[in-house]
Amino acid sequence: MDKPFKNIDEQLDILRSRNLEIDDEKEAREALTIYGYYEIVNGYKSFILESDDSDNFKTGETFSHLYSLYQLDKDIRNGVLRATLEVELSLRTAIAYTIAEDFGEKQTDYLNPRNYRRGHKRQNSNRYPLYQLLDKLNNIANDDIEPYKHYRENHGNIPPWILLKGTSFGNLVNFYKLLKPKQKDKVISICTGLPEQFITDSIKLMFAQALCMIHSYRNRAAHSGRLFSYRSQKIMEYNEPLHEKIMEITREEYNNGVGQTGLFTLQNILSIFKNQRSGFLFEFSVYYSIGYHCQYYPSDLDLLCEQTMINKNDMLRGIEKYSK
């Protein structure tokens, strides 16, 4: 059954009827006008309702509290977008550098399908992923926008560091998957700073899964989905270099859900990249924003630790670091 339209006055009446105190009506009206009832109320009410099967809010709960949860998550989303953009820029540079060095800067050379793996056909598709990717790259090359038009008409060629500017993060992740082992090692080395001779199968698996998880969080943030409680379906399999050496968690802790997904896991996989700005942008958005929110709603700290999967001691250290 479709829900009928409700104006701002009616929206406020609904919230009052459900036991939510409108403690600052001007703020509430502005928030609902700018961001909408669904984004604020439906997105975050579950944390302050009486119970899972009730639409009534806990006694004493306010719109300001609800709105602060929304603003907190919006700040984290913006931070995740900025952090993952840094990863995208690094990955794009690494792939372009690698294929230019190994295959040359001419389109006819670096777009030669022999240089790549075909990948596996997806369900309901009769084409290999490689040819779908090459179609996208050729479409970019033939686009009538700059800088592609300039390079095509004035140089007769678009080098990879220019062509790849037109790719999305998802395109780049797929491109990486279709590289052959030698080129994958180079990309990992450029992105992480780890010498190629030290790149093991475990590190290759970790890097590939990290890209998929980062892409998942990037998409979630870009589409304004609630993020601090998000659990990506793309999980990190137990991996000694990541879980034991970086995250310092045991196999038992992993089996109990720690280090598989969640913001805590995302923070740690961002730390493997040589581009430290991605980690800084992520950590600042999470710890500063949670610290600011908890100045006004300190009882939410345990909730936010649970939802982000960041343990309380790490959370407090992060808040102290980024709140100075």
Give the role of each language-model region.
Residues 1-324:
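Long, contiguous internal "core" modules enriched in hydrophobic/ aromatic residues
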